[in-house]
Amino acid sequence: MNGKSEKVHGKSMLSKVMIPMLILGILEVAVFAIVMLVSGELTYIKKYSYNLLIEKTANRASYVEYMLNQKTSPVYETAVEINHITEEYLDENGITLDQLSEDKEVNKELLIRSSDALVSLIRRDMVNDAFIILDTGSLYDTDTDTVRAGLYLRDTDAYENSTTDIKDIYMEMGSSDIAHELGTALDSEWAPHLVINDDNDFSFYTVPMESKELYPDKPVYNLGYWSGFSKISPSAQKSMKYTFPLVSSDGRVYGVVGIGLMEKTILKNIPANDFFNESACYIISSDIEGDGIYTPELHSGPIYTRLVSADTVFDENADNSYGIYELRQGTKAHPSAAYSE
């Protein structure tokens, strides 16, 4: 009987101690919350968190832009080299650029002479693709397609280059005779020529070809063009391309030279583990129409597929808080997703 009384008495003492402490703790939390709300501290904390996110994304964007800009100068240098090769070849044979649209052997020889410059461009610029596309007029055209002669080389791993040979480089597009001459293998997605149609985006070729005429007062080295991810054939892997017009000494544009970066290469520069949880990712997008509506080109992080659908709109005119924009699903704002430019 005494033991039972002691147990009840013990419980009573514990309750007398714990209940006031619990009430005191709740009061402290309530007072703290009220102080935070009244003083505006929550707003400052939210703003600080947003600023951290904006700073992180801005730093990463600057890094990616710097990386891409670093890869443009070698393209211009290669264009100058190929222009010299072309002029030298034309002078040797007493012909003009008109032969590009009349003689397939002229195209082949010019591409063979330029092939070493493309291999060098892949190596020193650490890119996946290097290519030349010539303006061959209607020489290769079919009844349904516009066709151009060219040479397109690809190294699927831009950061591991062979120092002794070019066995790690494959030909994506070009004459098989050139592949034999160069000593490189044909890729499984190989095509002999570039077929230009509505199935893929070929702005990497068409825009630089028109740039000299559209911007006659611009220096040639300012006519380079970054395009989005595109394929050179229906089965080829996509790459983001930078192209530069090939311009003769008399100002005639006779083709383009360019580089390409595959998705996996760029993803190495936008790692999802920059963030400490799985509720964020990086997105590279483009404003194609110049209207503030961005089209996603590439993303990192698994959260993307859960937040973004075909109806999602990236609009710089959308509601934002401290530079963080809400995603819109069609005309409605997404309640649980946001992005920073």
Region roles according to the model:
Residues 1-10:
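N-terminal Lys/Arg-rich, disordered targeting/topogenic segments
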Residues 9-109, 126-128:
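Juxtamembrane extracytoplasmic/periplasmic/luminal helical "stalk" adjacent to the first N-terminal
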Residues 104-117, 201-208:
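Well-ordered, non-membrane alpha-helical segments in soluble/globular domains
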Residues 112-142, 284-311:
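Extracytoplasmic ligand-binding sensor domains of the Cache superfamily
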Residues 170-258:
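Extracytoplasmic/periplasmic ligand-binding sensor regions of membrane-associated signaling proteins
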Residues 264-341:
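Intrinsic low-complexity, intrinsically disordered coil/linker regions enriched in small/polar
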